[in-house]
Amino acid sequence: MKIHKLCFLALLLAHTTSAVNLNLNLKTSELVFLGDAELGPASDGVSRSGALSMTRDENPFSHGQSLWSTPVPFKPSSNSSSPYPFETSFTFSISTRIKPAPGHGLAFVVVPSIESDGPGPAGYLGIFNKTNNGNPKNHIFAVEFDVFQDKGFGDINDNHVGININSVTSVVAEKAGYWVQTGIGKMKHWSFKEFKLSNGERYKAWIEYRNSKVTVTLAPETVKKPKKPLIVAHLDLSKVFLQNMYPGFSGAMGRGVERHDIWSWTFQNSAKRI
């Protein structure tokens, strides 16, 4: 699998031993592209859209990754049991063509290296493969945005968000959507609004990890961050994260054509040593 380095959107790196800030502001910088990932083409097929694209229309079973090109500290030391808290947000879209059945989805990933160990297409989401799926030595954390139900991987439906640790099978998953609070005073209540991830619209995701708790919040791009997360999961990632890791994105499709685009991205890792 080829590794491409490409000047892309400005991810500004402010780095100390205990803090990292990445900001993507649609200008210039360097990412690492693996597989079919690229700076995506615009609808005219000639110019570039300004988005990171994980898959290519012309390649059946296309899959790829785009990662930050330098290692980011996720723990104070290799044997630390206290990973740094982190938060990331990004805007994405998934666009499909109906025939054949589209799939499969994209994911925010944190991986131990940029040397890919043969990630697979389709349900493996460009992260895992048949051989390494489920291996605790993978040291991979991911949040998937899955638009194809693969019952063999335990998918709850064809439109869900899940947290994955070393496996394409999610440890927790919820149908895609967001929470809205309505009413006044004591009459306030939460209502859930479901939406289709693969309708081509842009959505924004917020992922946070602190005190062994992962929260995932999702909403349409034009909606402010909901106060109630879509997913709250108590997970100890101290055995998953190595001292240095590479954050980024992956995506994969099957026979059907599907675009997986990232339009903006911020990442912050800021923590005191414990």
Swiss-Prot record:
Location relative to the cell: Secreted, Extracellular space, Apoplast; Cell membrane
Region Legume-lectin like: start-end pairs: 28-268
Domain of life (superkingdom): Eukaryota
SUPFAM superfamilies the record matches: Concanavalin A-like lectins/glucanases (SSF49899)
Entry's induction text: Strongly induced locally by salicylic acid (SA). Completely dependent on NPR1 for early up-regulation by SA. Up-regulated upon avirulent pathogen infection via an SA-mediated pathway. Up-regulated locally and systematically during systemic acquired resistance (SAR). The local induction is independent of EDS1 while the systemic transcriptional regulation is EDS1-dependent.
CDD domains to which the protein is assigned, alphabetical: lectin_legume_LecRK_Arcelin_ConA (cd06899)
UniProt feature coiled coil, ranges: none
Gene Ontology annotations for the cellular component aspect, listed alphabetically: apoplast; plasma membrane
One GO biological process term: cellular response to salicylic acid stimulus
Pfam families cross-referenced by the UniProt entry: Lectin_legB
Residues that carry a glycan: 129
GO MF annotation list: carbohydrate binding; kinase activity
Signal peptide as annotated in the record: 1-19
InterPro entries: ConA-like_dom_sf, L-lectin, Legume_lectin_dom, Leguminous_Lectin
Keywords of the record: Apoplast, Cell membrane, Glycoprotein, Kinase, Lectin, Membrane, Phosphoprotein, Secreted, Signal, Transferase
Disordered: annotated span: 62-81
Family, similarity comment: Belongs to the leguminous lectin family.
Annotated function: Plays a positive role in the effector-triggered immunity (ETI) response. Involved in salicylic acid (SA)-mediated processes occurring in ETI response, but is not involved in the autophagy process. Promotes systemic rather than local immunity. Essential for systemic acquired resistance (SAR), but not necessary for immune signaling downstream of SA. May act in parallel with SA.
Name the record gives this protein: Lectin-like protein
Species, as recorded: Arabidopsis thaliana (Mouse-ear cress)
